[in-house]
């Protein structure tokens, strides 16, 4: 089971690139560059920003493709999947992307650091909820084709129903019951399920916060 998450971070682009390429977290063969070279990626991304005079504001986007610890997948295949996703993400066309697959924790996961400035035309990266959903859908299709588990809302990795969400007042309880039947949309329920998803894949406090 693989999940895609957009990561919000206050770190600068240099710090983010240094973190995802740490030797103890990955191996040289598990780091790839799309429209850039891993060894010179910081200089290349900075050069693109300076070329178009866009060195301020949001400097990058960070995403993670994470596999459940019990999923049967090799680090090499996980990295290949990540590179394939990056190459076929339309919104990233013309953007330098660093892909690094980490193997230092209980589960395999790949980081995507996307330069916010397009090296071809200088436009800033436009990223919508629809783009994120498309990325998730293609991730699920990868898993389906490879015989891996597909995330199901309200279910664990093994396919069991998750524990019922508990509400501390009657109004919230009734709202959640309606949401379970699909009668209304509940952000409380969505948040609870998102937390449960993270509990399934996170192996540390820091990883839980990142997800």
Across the structure, where does each feature detected by a protein language model lie?
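N-terminal nicking endonuclease/strand-transfer module with a His-rich metal-binding environment
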Residues: 1-211
């Amino acid at each position: 089971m693989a999940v895609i998450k957009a990561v919000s971070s206050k770190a600068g682009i240099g710090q983010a690139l240094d973190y995802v390429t740490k030797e103890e977290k990955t191996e040289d063969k598990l780091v790839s560059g799309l429209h850039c070279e891993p060894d010179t990626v910081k200089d290349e991304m900075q050069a693109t920003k300076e070329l178009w005079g866009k060195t301020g504001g949001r400097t990058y986007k960070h995403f993670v493709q994470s596999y459940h610890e019990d999923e049967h997948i090799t680090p090499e295949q996980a990295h290949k999947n990540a590179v394939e996703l990056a190459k076929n993400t339309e919104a990233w066309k013309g953007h330098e992307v660093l892909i690094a697959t980490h193997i230092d924790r209980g589960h395999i996961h790949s980081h995507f650091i996307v330069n916010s400035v397009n090296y071809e035309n200088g436009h800033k990266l436009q990223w919508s909820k629809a783009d994120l959903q498309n990325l998730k859908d293609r991730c699920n299709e990868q898993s389906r084709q490879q015989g891996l588990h597909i995330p199901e809302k309200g279910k664990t990795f093994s396919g069991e129903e998750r524990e019922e969400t508990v509400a501390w007042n009657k109004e919230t309880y009734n709202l959640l019951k309606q949401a379970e039947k699909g009668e209304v949309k509940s952000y409380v329920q969505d948040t609870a399920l998102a937390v449960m998803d993270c509990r399934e894949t996170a192996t540390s406090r820091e990883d839980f916060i990142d997800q």
